[in-house]
Amino acid sequence: MPLLERAVAAGRFPSLHRLPWRSDPLAACAYVAELLGDDNAVAQQLAVWVSDLRPRQKRKMLNRSVEKGTHYKWFLGGHRSDYAVWVHQYRPASVFVSSDRFAASIHNHRYPFVSRVLSGSLYISTFEVSSDEPRCSISLKGEQVLEVGDVMFLDSNDVHRIDRVLDDTTTIVVQGPPVRHYSTRFDPRNGCSERIYDLDALFPNLTAAFTKDGFIVG
């Protein structure tokens, strides 16, 4: 069944919650990769789905969407913390190439994910790293170009970088559940890495930002 086949008429994003996101997230992602790989109408179906959103659904989408330095993440749907579906709309090529953060950095993710190119192209490098400790070795593993219709499936430990994009590049992304509370960004210039923690991990230390010696700073 195409991923969006039942989503157009109902105005709801298709549910993928029956997949084994917790017990076998890689198998769940592999199944989604097959769905996306076989669905040549996904871009057109997605355009119809977005245009049919009711005001409340549109507001929910906007409230969950995120702006990054390299791209916009438009939230389409998901199920609790099992999976989430996004459209990544990349910034113009001239803007993207000036960034060395977010998608333009050498990094991995907290979760596995599957991505299909809806428009444009992405030029991607993959890397081998010795560890995600503060000091590590980083070496180029391979390079590839993803064009319209191509599907990419990455584990949470796969280290990669988007080197550049064409103008008007968009992808649909289905991400699985987080397998840890941080992703890692790597700097090839000095062999250093930096862990980027999620809000769940940072929350216990929140009060340290506005208290001192146990007293609230006024």
Question: Predicted segment positions?
Answer:
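A short secondary-structure junction signal
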Residues: 86-88, 98-100, 125-137, 163-165, ...
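Long hydrophobic alpha-helical segments typical of transmembrane helices together
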Residues: 190-218
